Amino acid sequence: MDNYVVLVPGQSEQFLDREETLLWLQSWLNNFDELPYDLACKSSILEASQYLLDTACDLEIKNGFTIQWYAVRLESPDL
């Protein structure tokens, strides 16, 4: 299963699975009046969020405010 750490300026990091990360990205994309140029050609917010998850690791929401996500491996500590 893919896991991601998601970062929002001024907030604590969150660890999400792939589906949760897609929903998280969709919620941010829904706030745009107009999607950025490279996402505007996508047929849906879901397709745009999948494209972002597969090809990028950050998205500028507004000038100076960028969200980030990175794939991580979560492992149980050895005891």
Tell me what each language-model feature is.
Residues M1-L35:
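N-terminal prepro regions of secreted peptide precursors
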Residues G10, D17, S43-S44, A71:
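Secondary-structure junction/capping motif
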Residues D54-L79:
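Short, compact, well-ordered microdomains
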Residues V6, Y37-C41, Y70, L74:
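Hydrophobic transmembrane signal anchors and adjacent membrane-proximal interface regions, especially
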Residues Q11-D17, E34-L39, K62, T66, ...:
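Generic marker of "main functional regions" within proteins
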